[in-house]
């Protein structure tokens, strides 16, 4: 993944959150007592509101959590990493393409192929889209990139967390969607290609002036442009991105470059499943696969843990290996992603983009 900014701000501490909560409860209790004394019925609670002030009415509790097999997802991850580095244009890159396709046999799959003109020359790019139809009019996109950093192609860098963990996550989500009729929106799983910059992007002591701005996100930018041209973009209700979600010390950032109301839905899904302590403890601004869709007015949420080791020390280094990842982290993010989809299915209408 590539970063616009690594600015992070800490959310209020737990102690302050408890104090604020206690004050709010005290005020609510006083209002309730006042209404009761006057023989009035307390007003119903207002719907949750996002940081822009737009009201968001969430579906009620939807029952048992969705299934997600984290051990199987972890096995997919290990098999992807076993191919070795998978930079754009390399033999291992093609092997991972074929591996993903082999796990989607029998599913409706669209191949989006084109040639990208990059600072390193022209390269074939291959986006893979698995489509699971629903009864409601609209599409929820769940995305992950699968390539590894091109400048590190001659090292042992395998991108276990960056590109590997999220690609494995989507394969297991496909298992949970497969063969189960959907009453909600259609879900399209996208393994997008050529996300990483072809030139050094400032990580690992490389020159910061080598910016990602015109040298990354090739696959997802092409897809956003294509879907804008053929009318698909208007049908997309939400774009959910997973990136760097396998860290054993999982802390998903609140991305300030995402859509506030959709991030709030993700937070609600985490809360319902008891995983809220792993979400939104920090704010961040991330330039990631969702940006081309955000720019075109699609509601987006980037689920990313951009603290991979102390001060993100393992990111874009050969130390990004499977031993630092956990099936439990895959379980948390996979379950929250599926619960988010369930909540979105029941929200009618969805907030404005």
Model-identified regions with their sequence ranges:
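N-terminal secretory signal peptides that target proteins for export/translocation
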Residues: 1-13
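C-terminal motif of bacterial Sec signal peptides marking the signal peptidase cleavage site
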Residues: 26-29
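Short, low-complexity, disordered segments immediately C-terminal to signal peptides
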Residues: 31-54
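N-terminal capping segment at the start of a domain
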Residues: 49-95, 310-324
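Active-site-adjacent substrate-binding region
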Residues: 56, 64, 92, 115-117, ...
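A non-catalytic alpha/beta surface segment that caps or lines the substrate-entry region
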Residues: 66, 75-135
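Active-site-proximal beta-strand/loop segments in catalytic clefts of secreted hydrolases
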Residues: 80, 112-114, 132-134, 143-147, ...
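Acidic/histidine-rich catalytic neighborhood of metal-dependent amide-processing enzymes
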Residues: 156-265, 285
């Amino acid at each position: 993944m590539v970063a616009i900014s690594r600015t992070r701000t800490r959310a209020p501490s737990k102690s302050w959150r408890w104090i604020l909560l206690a004050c709010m409860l005290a005020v609510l209790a006083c209002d309730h007592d006042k209404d009761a004394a006057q023989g009035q019925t307390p007003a119903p609670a207002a719907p949750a509101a996002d940081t822009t002030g737009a009201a968001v009415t969430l579906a009620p509790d939807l029952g048992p959590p969705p299934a997600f097999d984290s051990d199987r997802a972890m096995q997919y991850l290990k098999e992807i990493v076993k191919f070795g580095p998978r930079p754009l244009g390399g033999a291992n890159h093609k092997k991972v393409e074929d591996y993903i396709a082999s796990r989607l046999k029998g599913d409706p799959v669209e191949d989006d192929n084109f040639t990208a003109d990059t600072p390193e020359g022209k390269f074939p790019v291959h986006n893979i889209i698995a489509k699971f139809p629903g009864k409601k009019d609209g599409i929820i996109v769940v995305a992950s990139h699968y390539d590894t950093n091109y400048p590190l192609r001659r090292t042992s860098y395998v991108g276990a967390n960056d590109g590997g963990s999220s690609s494995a996550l989507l394969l297991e989500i496909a298992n949970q969607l497969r063969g189960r009729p959907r009453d909600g929106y259609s879900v399209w799983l996208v393994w997008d290609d050529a996300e990483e910059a072809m030139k050094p992007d400032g990580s690992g002591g490389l020159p910061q002036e080598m910016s990602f701005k015109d040298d990354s996100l090739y696959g997802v930018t092409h897809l956003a442009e294509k879907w804008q041209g053929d009318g698909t973009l208007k049908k997309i209700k939400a774009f959910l991105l997973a990136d760097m979600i396998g860290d054993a010390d999982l802390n998903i950032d609140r991305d300030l470059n995402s859509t506030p109301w959709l991030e709030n839905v993700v937070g609600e899904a985490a809360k319902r499943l008891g995983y809220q302590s792993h979400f939104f403890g920090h704010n961040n601004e991330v330039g990631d696969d969702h940006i081309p869709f955000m720019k075109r007015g699609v509601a987006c949420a980037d689920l990313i843990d951009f603290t991979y080791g102390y001060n993100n020390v393992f990111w874009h280094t050969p130390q990004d290996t499977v031993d630092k990842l956990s099936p439990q982290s895959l379980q948390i993010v996979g379950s929250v992603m599926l619960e988010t989809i369930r909540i979105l299915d029941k929200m009618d209408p969805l907030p404005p983009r």
